[in-house]
Regions:
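Globin-like tetrapyrrole-binding proteins
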Residues: 7
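A conserved beta-strand-loop-helix scaffold within acyl/acetyltransferase catalytic domains
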Residues: 10, 15-32, 38, 44-58, ...
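A short acidic, glycine-rich active-site loop
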Residues: 201-210
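Residue-identity detector for glycine
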Residues: 272-275, 296
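Long, low-complexity, intrinsically disordered segments
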Residues: 283-299
Length: 299
């Protein structure tokens, strides 16, 4: 990988890697920094009948009383509802007053979404929220990528969607459901910690107004997940800062030209027929969207 990066005149950055990958990254001479924590729900033990999920249970029932319905549309039928999905997405983008992101954050793309089963929330026959599904072929894991809802959706609509998705995946034998990353979560800025750790901990504690990181973690915490650390591995010193800058540009500028010498955009996976393999680590797209109700975080 380092040779490939050198030949492309780029900087190697391993993004959102798991703990088992750390030995490999260290052996490659890369610097390791903690990026955040991923929320994972063990579906074998998932139940709404627990005090920890009381707020989720209450929100789901409130939306159900408004006539909400949950439905899964198979990938083959998604083109039929694509215009409706676009309407929901456009309304969501306008309400959030920001542009679409990209790379590891989901963005509305018709050619991409048509490859995936789509979960819907409908009220009076009209789509008020949706998410595309990432499902492993061996049913070891399920997750979502892009999540959108209309501005007039009842409070708790995303909870309604998540509850039914968890139950749907559980009933089909999936072992775990990934709620995505909480960036900067679990990083301790102790006195002897590296400067990056101190800065990350400071942003997590005091940057809620601008970034919503604490609200994002709090939203996911409602589902009583296990938190698994995720890391970034890259060049030492100034090279790491430059690589992180490149990463930020990839996420914030999804339509960057492919001719850029350092920012070659990989294609998002083209398969997703309900049983297709998904990338090894899900990006935080849905993660951010799911927290939109409580934290105002963009996806």
């Amino acid at each position: 990988m380092r040779d490939m990066a050198d030949r492309a005149q780029g900087r190697l950055l391993l993004y959102q890697i798991t703990a088992p990958m750390l030995d490999l990254a260290i052996g490659m001479g890369l610097e390791i920094i903690k990026y955040g924590e991923e929320a994972v729900v063990d579906l074998s033990a998932f139940t709404l009948d627990t005090p920890r999920l009381r707020s989720v249970r209450k929100a789901e029932r409130a939306v159900a009383r408004k006539g909400a319905e949950f439905r899964i549309v198979p990938a083959a039928a998604v083109p039929v509802i694509m215009d409706e999905l676009a309407r929901v997405s456009d309304e969501w983008v306008r309400a959030k007053r920001h542009e679409e992101k990209g790379f590891s954050l989901g963005r509305f793309d018709r050619d991409y979404l048509r490859h995936f089963d789509i979960a819907l929330v409908l009220i009076d026959g009209r789509i008020v929220a949706f998410a595309n599904l990432w499902l492993t072929a061996d049913r070891s894991e399920a997750s979502v990528d892009l999540m959108r809802q209309v501005d007039a959706a009842p409070p708790g609509t995303m909870d309604f969607l998540f509850v039914h998705l968890l139950q749907w995946a559980q009933a089909r034998g999936y072992r775990r459901f990934t709620l995505g990353i909480a960036p900067l979560s679990g990083i301790e800025g102790r006195r002897l910690a590296p400067a990056w750790a101190k800065a990350a901990a400071l942003v997590f504690r005091h940057g809620e107004r601008f970034y919503g990181f604490r609200g994002l973690r709090a939203y996911k915490e409602k589902y009583a997940p296990e938190w698994e650390p995720r890391y970034i591995a890259g060049p030492h010193g100034l090279g790491m800062l430059k690589a992180l800058r490149d990463l930020s540009r990839l996420v914030g500028r999804p339509m960057v030209e492919a001719s850029s010498p350092h920012l070659a955009l990989p294609a998002r996976p083209a398969r997703g027929d309900g049983g297709a393999d998904r990338p090894p680590t899900p990006p935080p797209a849905a993660n951010n969207a799911a927290a939109a109700e409580t934290a105002g975080v963009a996806a």
